[in-house]
């Protein structure tokens, strides 16, 4: 099975056929397009940890498929169906340890473990358990593209309905939430794509997204590739842009959303939400339901990953020359948490979650009401 993303291969972060997986090395973009072969879970873990692949949905799928490739190419396995189940479960636990903040990865692992456990109870041999796992991982790949397109559709319709003061809409976004962060199409950038397709997008503004520059390197690359009218700004210019009246709405993605709507996303998201609130601009999160963690009551429980000081001390997110003084201490959280009271709505593949006058969201109720369609 091949991934079903439409368009040019340059915008495929994940290239998969059964037994074969290549990941686009996003550290090299936009200057080089290089795909790395992923042969097993060790390769998958390294690719996720070292930011070859990033974006919560893409991380989950890349991890799942790295294990699918490993078991597809096993020359032999000396064990029972229960042994195969244990083997797969341990590999999934290992993959989850690569990046702790994005809930999609742990959510995918939980769902895949359920598939494995069920298969082990009915399978006659280990190979049948492996086959069940491979098929489940491939379904996740297909489902991600489908859910992203639904997010784009719901988001575009909602914005057109609520932003009625102008015929054209200008959107500010942060980090990268497009085809490069998912299996295809994107979440927040998917909404921008849908608005552009509908003919109502005036312009998209994207932040550079320091220190790893996902905005300048990746989002700008996607927008230019698709001829979407876009402007790159410095992270520190966002408030001035809002004050100038050039932003109608802010849309970002999410790595983990708590039950009350508190949202962990790329560092700098909180800044944008505060500025948007001050300027009376609606601030939306676009994310699949797999990014929602109902086990967490609020964002205070979200574990925030801290990354290498080198990403701040050197250019290109740590890959280039040193620009800061040796000996300076560094604080480099990869994410921050935006409180729910700053968020206007959460756009999902099942519709837009709103607060209905409250300070926080009742996401559990939304999930319950839409569970029949999941």
Curated annotation (Swiss-Prot):
Belongs to the eIF-2B alpha/beta/delta subunits family. MtnA subfamily. HAMAP family: Salvage_MtnA (MF_01678). NCBIfam families: eIF-2B_rel, PRK05720.1, salvage_mtnA. InterPro entries: IF-2B-related, IF-M1Pi, IF_2B-like_C, Initiation_fac_2B_a/b/d, M1Pi_N, NagB/RpiA_transferase-like. Induction: By cytokinin (kinetin) in suspension cell culture. It is found in: Cytoplasm; Nucleus. Catalyzes the interconversion of methylthioribose-1-phosphate (MTR-1-P) into methylthioribulose-1-phosphate (MTRu-1-P). SUPFAM superfamilies: NagB/RpiA/CoA transferase-like (SSF100950). Coiled coil: none annotated. Pathway: Amino-acid biosynthesis; L-methionine biosynthesis via salvage pathway; L-methionine from S-methyl-5-thio-alpha-D-ribose 1-phosphate: step 1/6. GO terms for biological process: L-methionine salvage from methylthioadenosine. One of its GO terms (molecular function) is S-methyl-5-thioribose-1-phosphate isomerase activity. It catalyses: 5-(methylsulfanyl)-alpha-D-ribose 1-phosphate = 5-(methylsulfanyl)-D-ribulose 1-phosphate. This is Methylthioribose-1-phosphate isomerase. Keywords: Amino-acid biosynthesis, Cytoplasm, Isomerase, Methionine biosynthesis, Nucleus. The active site is at 255 (proton donor). The record marks 175 as: Transition state stabilizer. One of its GO terms (cellular component) is cytoplasm. Its EC number is 5.3.1.23.
């Amino acid at each position: 099975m091949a991934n079903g993303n439409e368009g040019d291969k340059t915008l495929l972060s994940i290239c998969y056929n059964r037994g074969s997986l290549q990941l686009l090395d996003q550290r090299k973009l936009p200057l080089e397009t290089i795909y790395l072969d992923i042969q097993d879970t060790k390769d998958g873990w390294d690719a996720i940890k070292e930011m070859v692949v990033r974006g919560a949905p893409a991380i989950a799928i890349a991890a799942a498929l790295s294990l699918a490739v490993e078991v597809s190419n096993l020359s032999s396995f000396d064990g029972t169906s229960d042994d195969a189940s244990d083997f797969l479960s341990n590999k999934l636990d290992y993959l989850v340890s690569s990046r702790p903040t994005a809930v999609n990865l742990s959510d995918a692992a939980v769902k895949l473990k359920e598939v494995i456990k069920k298969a082990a109870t009915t399978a006659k041999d280990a190979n049948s358990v492996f086959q069940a796992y491979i098929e489940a991982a491939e379904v996740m790949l297909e489902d991600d593209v489908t859910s992203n397109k639904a997010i784009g559709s719901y988001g575009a319709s909602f914005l057109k309905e609520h932003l009625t003061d102008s015929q054209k809409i200008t959107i500010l976004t942060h980090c990268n939430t497009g085809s490069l962060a998912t299996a295809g199409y994107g979440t927040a950038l998917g909404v921008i794509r849908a608005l552009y397709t509908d003919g109502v997008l005036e312009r998209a503004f994207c932040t550079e997204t320091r220190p790893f520059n996902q905005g300048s390197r990746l989002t700008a690359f996607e927008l230019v590739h698709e001829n979407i009218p876009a402007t790159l700004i410095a992270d520190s210019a966002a408030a001035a842009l809002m004050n100038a009246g050039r932003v109608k709405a802010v849309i970002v993605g999410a790595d983990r959303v708590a039950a009350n709507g508190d949202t962990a996303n790329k560092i700098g998201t909180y800044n944008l939400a505060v500025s948007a609130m001050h300027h009376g601009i609606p601030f939306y999160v676009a994310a699949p339901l797999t990014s929602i963690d109902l086990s967490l009551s609020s964002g205070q429980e979200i574990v925030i990953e801290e990354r290498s000081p080198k990403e701040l001390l050197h250019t290109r997110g740590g890959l280039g020359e040193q620009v800061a003084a040796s000996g300076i201490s560094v604080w480099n959280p990869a994410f921050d948490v935006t409180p729910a009271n700053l968020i206007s709505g959460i756009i999902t593949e099942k519709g837009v979650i709103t607060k209905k006058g409250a300070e926080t969201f009742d996401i559990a109720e939304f999930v319950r009401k839409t569970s029949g369609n999941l």
